[in-house]
Amino acid sequence: MQDPAAYYQTMMAKQQQQQQPQFAEQEQLKCPRCDSPNTKFCYYNNYNLSQPRHFCKSCRRYWTKGGALRNVPVGGGSRKNATKRSTSSSSSASSPSNSSQNKKTKNPDPDPDPRNSQKPDLDPTRMLYGFPIGDQDVKGMEIGGSFSSLLANNMQLGLGGGGIMLDGSGWDHPGMGLGLRRTEPGNNNNNPWTDLAMNRAEKN
């Protein structure tokens, strides 16, 4: 009778010689188009283990093992922008001459109105709620070009009789624990918050 350890070793050696790779990742296949051994496994088509996809590095084409070969041109996976670059460079070369001709033929403003030239430029950063700050033509902003005329002195949000005072001087309920003082009716001229906010908006 044969030693079981020796029998096991010989059987394992035979299996390794006869056994082909179990997964497609381990296979080194030749390209079916150019017969190059310079190939690699990429992925399984639709996650199906029976359809491994391979890539040939020499002819730069993909194929599925056991599948039909498509008529794909060599290097079809790469993008070449050389034609786009040449057309864009030729159009950019002709554009400076066109722009210089446009500058020569451009007419000055047909209606040179001094009132229009004195209007301030409407910078989009100076827009607040859709109204340009400092534009005197907007109704409701005739006084100094600010929104301070639109604010009521003691406007209050109704929160059960109390609420937040919008004049910026404090909270209506001093027990809020924030250390802010109670609004006093005679202290409206001494309110730094609304003037500070309006001055900040006007300086921009």
UniProtKB/Swiss-Prot annotation:
Q: Which PANTHER family match?
A: DOF ZINC FINGER PROTEIN DOF1.4-RELATED, DOF ZINC FINGER PROTEIN DOF3.1
Taxonomic classification, please? Eukaryota, Viridiplantae, Streptophyta, Embryophyta, Tracheophyta
Q: So where does Zn(2+) get bound?
A: C31, C34, C56, C59
Q: TM segments?
A: none
Q: What Pfam families does UniProt report for this protein, alphabetically?
A: Zn_ribbon_Dof
> Where are the Dof-type Zn fingers located?
29-83
Q: Where is this region: Disordered?
A: 1-25, 70-128, 182-204
Primary gene name: DOF3.1
**Top-level taxon:** Eukaryota
The record's Gene Ontology cellular component field reads: nucleus
> What keywords would UniProt list here?
DNA-binding, Metal-binding, Nucleus, Transcription, Transcription regulation, Zinc, Zinc-finger
Organism (species): Arabidopsis thaliana (Mouse-ear cress)
Q: Which PROSITE patterns match?
A: ZF_DOF_1, ZF_DOF_2
- Cited function: Transcription factor that binds specifically to a 5'-AA[AG]G-3' consensus core sequence.
The protein's name = Dof zinc finger protein DOF3.1
What subcellular locations does the record give? Nucleus
